[in-house]
């Protein structure tokens, strides 16, 4: 039950942030939080709605929303991020304070080579070259922008195929995945949340500057 309360609070905070606290549809928010809790109360974990520590997308009927939550430093959080990337078919919009994790960068490049539209916004700290995968992504043809409009762009966000959202505390780094105590939350197949997350990502993309080598 504590886990449900935590997820409910995370969802409420996310909803508030993505909507900038304005014109909130509280009835829709209440329904979106209540329905999953009611379904969990009626079913055990085999229902496929809430999963913890799993590295692969949950098994559920196409179009059904599901939530996964994983932590580091045991590698499960990184595996969950990779499952979101690998599961994308059309587009991946990424906003990252840091992107120095070689596995995550290579999986993004692999999806781009498979025809998925991949776009990445990074914080200005990635310009210093220390383990940044900025050049590697750009060399693979992935559009990369640097956010110079704010002092710190601290997001860790991926929106996949316009219906799946990944966020959490974990930076896309080796330390975040394998040394620090971090968390990753994924909401699969929830277009309304993904639309709000995509709008937040788009604001970052539009305020950022395209990066080119040299």
Model-identified regions with their sequence ranges:
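Short beta-strand scaffold segments in enzyme catalytic cores
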Residues: 156-159, 185
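Signature of lipid phosphatidyltransferase scaffolds
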Residues: 165-214
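Short, solvent-exposed loop/turn segments at the edges of secondary structure
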Residues: 139, 152-153, 160, 179-180
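Primarily the HKD phosphodiesterase
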Residues: 81-143
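Short, small/polar-rich loop/turn modules that mediate ligand/substrate recognition or access, typified
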Residues: 2-71, 75, 79, 202-214
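General small-molecule cofactor/ligand-binding pocket signal
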Residues: 70, 121, 145-147
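Solvent-exposed loop/turn segments at secondary-structure junctions
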Residues: 98-102, 124-128, 150-153, 164-165, ...
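Short, structured motif recognition centered on aromatic/hydrophobic residues
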Residues: 85, 97, 157, 197, ...
